[in-house]
Every structure is written in structure tokens, then in C-alpha cells.
């Protein structure tokens, strides 16, 4: 199973933010951000905090990619 966070990266660009900004605003740890950068799964609670900050839905952030 592979997870793509390309939607999240696009939203960050569209909002003029970088990964560090998102970590500060949501309280996400750098290790969790590294997991997302590497396409690894993270807890739903992390995605919920991101959705709250960026005013979006889960589907805007992640995509399941078949290998």
C-alpha cells in the first residue's frame, strides 16, 4: 500500500505555507511530517488537525496509490 500526500503539498503551496509552518500551526511533530514526506501512513487525528488548519477534507490531502 502506498499513500500519496501530493494534495497536501499542493495545498501548502496554494496557502503560501511550508512544512515547518504547518507543524507549528498544528502541533505535528517533525517525525510525523517526515513520515508523510516519505509516503508513510499517519494517524487520522493528524490528518484531522491538518484539515482544520487548511479548511479542507481528507480527500484533499491523501490518495491511495496501488503499487
Segments from the language model and where they lie:
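The alpha-helix within a helix-turn-helix
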Residues: 12, 23, 51
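Short, basic-rich loop-to-helix N-cap that marks the start of a DNA-contacting helix
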Residues: 39-52
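Key DNA-contact positions within bacterial/archaeal DNA-binding proteins
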Residues: 20, 31, 59
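Recognition helix of helix-turn-helix/homeodomain-like DNA-binding domains
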Residues: 28-41
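Short C-terminal boundary/hinge segments that cap the last helix of small helical domains
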Residues: 55-67
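A short, Lys/Arg-rich alpha-helix, primarily the initiator
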Residues: 1-20
